């Protein structure tokens, strides 16, 4: 009998915090399913969702402002445990008669949280010798305690940093347990969802695969599915998962646009067609893409040209597959959240999301998105469980337009060939030196400028390659990776000696912000 992995679930109500997705990821790491919804989710919808616990996120507003975001008051009478984080704690405090005012001294950054009184069940294992380092980000604080609550923790600047009413299973923390800067934060969230809410931890890779396979079979029946395979993590895992469910009913279309990494097309075919037995149609479209991109230097126009041509080619190939009624995409949960935010206007939208996107409506294909409940780290775990090569599953992000936006300015075959060889050397050396898995994203960039050099007794006038490597948790902010000088020297030497047309290599030490991770 299969496990229903959605019976135990946590509801996270979002008040606009930049960290809300991290809350969801921490809950998932405790092997418990959760969903993010806007703060004004109606009470009937919440009852229908039937959460085993509710988490109120932080947010940029002040609870005492006119029109400040709030929940329906009856939410606290549902009889399920509630954890308020930052703004969520202040909202809960105000609801139960407490007072929230601007702090005399705001707290942003690291702070030492000190136990006050007897910590309740939420704080088991959280304090060590009566204290715990935490991450603060607030300008308001609770000045008068809500009725029925006890103070559990304080800092040197704020006397009320954690509160509890164990009789009603209501808890609040002023700090952010979801961020990595709160070292034992995952313990607190795990305790809340497992011990206080009573979840048993059914959200595991094996159970997720079993559930997805059953749902795909129920949705698709005996109909045929097509999927645009890019070689990226999301589409690769989606392909492996769907193939496990319906076998030869899946056909993948792999468009080789000539802007992939070195030997990437052959690797994709070897992994899927040869090893996993997936039916893959490979389309060699390099010349069509290069022709379409000729003389175009604007990054956004290049993206549109590449995206539109992909759709055109995908449509051509799909029309040849008889009986296909489903289009599969590697949409993941952050894509769903961003799209929902863009539609409702209740979340700050950083970018518009397009997957296979923009397929003509007249194709009349039904949409199959087996990964839409999963975060990227969960997708990777599923990929490993499905038997995909670790190097494919944990590969760094690669932009949809490929090398088209890592070649600055106009795209030419000569430039793409130089860049993919330089990039391959760079990545190979990062693996060899043990850096690759410590870096969030690393890649080479082709600069369409020439510099003077000397090789042997002769003068050279050749191109420049820039190397980029960053560390980040969320890709919203990023710091440059401190690659040791000896490794920089070895990588630079290999690229200049082995890649014809390059005589200079530079290393990008810009953080995000102000720079972006990609150059275009």
Curated annotation (Swiss-Prot):
The keyword ATP-binding applies. Pathway: Purine metabolism; GMP biosynthesis; GMP from XMP (L-Gln route): step 1/1. The active site is at residues 86, 176, 178. Residues 9-202 form the Glutamine amidotransferase type-1 domain. ATP binds at residues 230-236. It is an enzyme of class 6 (ligase). One of its GO terms (biological process) is GMP biosynthetic process. PANTHER family: GMP SYNTHASE [GLUTAMINE-HYDROLYZING], GMP SYNTHASE-RELATED. Catalyzes the synthesis of GMP from XMP. This is GMP synthase [glutamine-hydrolyzing]. It comes from Geobacter sulfurreducens (strain ATCC 51573 / DSM 12127 / PCA). The gene is guaA.
């Amino acid at each position: 009998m299969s496990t229903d992995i959605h019976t135990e679930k946590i509801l996270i109500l979002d008040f606009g915090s930049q960290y809300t997705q991290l809350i969801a990821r921490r809950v998932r790491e405790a092997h418990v399913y959760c969903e993010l919804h806007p703060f004004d989710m109606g009470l009937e919808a919440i009852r229908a969702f039937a959460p085993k616990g509710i988490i109120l996120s932080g947010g940029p507003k002040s609870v005492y402002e006119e029109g400040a975001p709030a929940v329906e008051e009856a939410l606290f009478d549902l009889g399920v445990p509630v954890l308020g984080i930052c703004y969520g704690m202040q909202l809960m405090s105000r609801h139960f008669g407490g007072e929230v005012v601007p702090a005399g001294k705001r707290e942003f950054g690291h702070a030492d949280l000190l136990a006050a009184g007897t910590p309740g069940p939420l704080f088991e294992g959280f304090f060590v010798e009566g204290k715990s380092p935490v991450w603060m980000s607030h300008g308001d604080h609770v000045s008068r305690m809500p009725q029925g609550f006890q103070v559990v923790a304080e800092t040197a600047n704020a006397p009320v940093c954690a509160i509890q009413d164990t009789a009603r299973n209501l808890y609040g923390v002023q700090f952010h347990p979801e961020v990595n800067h709160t070292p034992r934060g995952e313990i607190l969230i795990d305790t809340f969802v497992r011990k206080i809410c009573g979840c048993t931890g059914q959200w595991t890779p094996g159970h997720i695969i079993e559930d997805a396979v059953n749902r795909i079979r129920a949705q698709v029946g005996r109909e045929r599915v097509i999927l645009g395979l890019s070689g990226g993590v999301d589409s690769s895992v989606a392909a492996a998962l769907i193939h496990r469910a319906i076998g030869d009913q899946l056909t993948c279309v792999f468009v080789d646009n000539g802007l992939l990494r070195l030997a990437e097309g052959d690797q994709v075919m070897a992994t899927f067609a040869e090893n996993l037995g997936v039916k893959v149609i490979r389309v060699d479209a390099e010349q069509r893409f290069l022709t379409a991109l000729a003389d175009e230097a604007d990054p956004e126009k290049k993206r549109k040209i590449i995206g539109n041509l992909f759709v055109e080619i995908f449509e051509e190939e799909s029309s040849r597959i008889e009986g296909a009624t489903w289009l599969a995409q590697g949409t993941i949960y952050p894509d769903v959240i961003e799209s929902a935010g863009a539609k409702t206007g209740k979340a700050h939208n950083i970018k518009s999301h397009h997957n296979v996107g923009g397929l003509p409506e007249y194709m009349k294909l039904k949409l199959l998105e087996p990964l839409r409940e999963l975060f990227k780290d969960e997708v990777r775990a599923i990929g490993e469980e499905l038997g995909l090569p670790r190097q494919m599953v944990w590969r760094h992000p690669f932009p949809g337009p490929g090398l088209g936006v890592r070649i600055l300015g106009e795209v030419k075959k000569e430039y793409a060939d130089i860049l993919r060889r330089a990039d391959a050397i760079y990545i190979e050396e990062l693996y060899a030196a043990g850096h690759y898995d410590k870096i969030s994203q690393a890649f080479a960039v082709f600069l369409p400028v020439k510099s003077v050099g000397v090789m042997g007794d002769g003068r050279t006038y050749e191109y420049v390659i820039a190397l980029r490597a960053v560390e980040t948790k969320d890709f919203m902010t990023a710091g440059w990776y401190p690659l040791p000088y000896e490794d920089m020297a070895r990588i630079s030497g290999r690229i200049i000696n082995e890649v014809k047309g390059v005589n200079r290599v530079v290393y990008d030490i810009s953080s995000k912000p102000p720079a972006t991770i990609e150059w275009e």
